[in-house]
Amino acid sequence: MVTKKEFLEELTNATNEAIKAADKNGDNQLSKKEVNDMYKKCKYPNPTLATNSLFELFDLDKDGKLSVNEVKTAVLVDYIIEAETCLKKFVDIIFKADSNKDNKITWDEARQYFITSGSNEAQAKVLANSMFEDVDSDDDKCITREELREYAIEYFEIYPTE
């Protein structure tokens, strides 16, 4: 599992490399022109709009340049948005098992979901047992969206640890 320190070191290194690649005047910051040129080089659709949007959101001190910290913030925000979108999709897919729509998955609902998804009865029981063993953190015989979300964060190592 990646630690926060390792994650931030990797983020800083990646940010420095990205800035270095686009920084034409060597000031360790990105101007609107440098960002716009980078988008054009990558054949990004509507580079001017993308550049203006990026600066509007992340040029925090409004000096017309993106610093290392501002770029790190942009990358981190993009990462969090993507991670949260993936988490929501994952939870929504699994919660198709919630047949009575009470925002809880029971063992029987999980078993039935696995059968509907192509497992035979024996496989479905094993999968439901495994799911409850891994995800039902409070042992109340139901899986909530929050339990599933927390499980996914840990299992898929979505966010760095301490």
Curated annotation (Swiss-Prot):
Gene Ontology CC annotations of this record: extracellular matrix
Entry superkingdom: Eukaryota
Name of the coding gene: cbpD2
Domain EF-hand as annotated: residue spans: 10-45, 46-81, 85-120, 123-158
Protein residues bound to Ca(2+) 3: 136, 138, 140, 142, 147
Residues involved in Ca(2+) 2 binding: 59, 61, 63, 65, 70
Protein name: Calcium-binding protein 4b
Keywords: Calcium, Metal-binding, Repeat
A GO MF term: calcium ion binding
Organism, as annotated: Dictyostelium discoideum (Social amoeba)
Claim: Transferase is one of the keywords in the record: no
Residues given in the record as Ca(2+) 1 binding sites: 23, 25, 27, 29, 34
